[in-house]
Amino acid sequence: MIIGYSRQFKKDLKRIKHNRKWNKIFNSSLSFSELTPWEYVIKSFESGSDLPDYFYAHEIHFSKSDIKNIRMATGEKSKIKVMDLHFDGRTGDCLLLYSESELGFYILRIGSHSDLFK
């Protein structure tokens, strides 16, 4: 599957890499895998595999203008689902926002609830 990254995601990633709260996402392995949460999610996207319930991936609603911007960035013409997952389990605060379509995955944002839903 194709994976794309938004400009805003790249800015978010630079910011959170310096936050100790995110060390476990990029440097510690999961209890059910030798991979870190970040590696596990990216490998799942690349292979088209479903994510385990641990990540609590669920659809969220985006505005029509935001969906339009995603369509322009990805060239996608079919239905786009915007998803939210929790790297650190259902009650965690380390989130990834991404869109899922027939073409693949487009990573939109990464951060905490307060970073992403102001």
Please report, for each region that a protein language model flagged, where it lies by residue.
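Basic, Lys/Arg-enriched alpha-helical interface segments
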Residues: 1-92, 100-108, 113-118
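Hydrophobic/aromatic beta-strand elements that line small-molecule binding cavities or substrate pockets
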Residues: 96
